[in-house]
């Protein structure tokens, strides 16, 4: 197995698990009412974009763009790191590299989602809401980014055993 083949597999596992986390947190955020049970802060932070098919959901383009960014950016950033990580030093390195990649992806996805929403409203500028989108995306990634990080580290550890 080529080093790039395994590395792309690690990147895909990071991207797919990040996209699944985004979809799951969006669905959960739309199912839980933010003001009920005192969960408002946690639900708001764990939800990057609201599930588009809920009553109070964002338009579908917000969700799809955020999902595409969270899927593609970790693949682009994690695959080269997985290729260059040496055997025996892979677990923590891949975990932190993936968490950082998900953090970048979350910030970009949050900025894109609020930018699309701002473009749809006539009185708002995309540059005015960009910091809040970056903050929301980074907060989401800090809260749930460990899940794709652990999955990618596990896939990477299994890949190292196969190569050696």
Predicted regions and their residues:
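Aromatic-anchored segments of alpha-helical transmembrane domains
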Residues: 18-23, 102-112
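Long, glycine/tryptophan/cysteine-rich extracytoplasmic
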Residues: 12-69, 124-136
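Transmembrane helix-loop junctions in multipass membrane proteins, especially transporters and channels
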Residues: 30-34, 82, 86-87, 118-122, ...
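Hydrophobic alpha-helical transmembrane segments
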Residues: 7-12, 61-84, 95-100, 110
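Hydrophobic core segments of alpha-helical transmembrane domains in multi-pass membrane transport
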Residues: 14-22, 73, 118, 146-151
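Cytoplasmic juxtamembrane regions at transmembrane-helix boundaries
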Residues: 1-6, 73-102, 160-164
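Alpha-helical transmembrane segments of multi-pass integral membrane proteins
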Residues: 105-164
């Amino acid at each position: 197995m080529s080093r790039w083949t395994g590395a792309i597999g690690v990147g895909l596992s990071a991207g797919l698990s990040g996209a699944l986390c985004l979809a799951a947190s969006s669905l959960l955020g739309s199912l839980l009412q933010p003001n009920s049970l005192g969960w408002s802060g946690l639900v708001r932070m764990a939800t990057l974009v609201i599930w588009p098919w809920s009553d109070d959901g964002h338009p579908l383009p917000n969700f799809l763009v955020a999902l595409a960014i969270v899927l593609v950016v970790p693949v682009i950033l994690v695959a080269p790191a997985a290729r260059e990580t040496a055997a025996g030093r892979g677990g923590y390195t891949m975990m932190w590299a993936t968490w950082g990649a998900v953090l970048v992806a979350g910030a970009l996805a949050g900025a894109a989602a609020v930018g699309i929403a701002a473009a749809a409203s006539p009185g708002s500028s995309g540059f005015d809401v960009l910091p809040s989108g970056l903050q929301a995306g980074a907060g989401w990634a800090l809260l749930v980014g460990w899940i794709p990080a652990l999955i990618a580290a596990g896939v990477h550890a299994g890949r190292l055993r196969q190569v050696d």
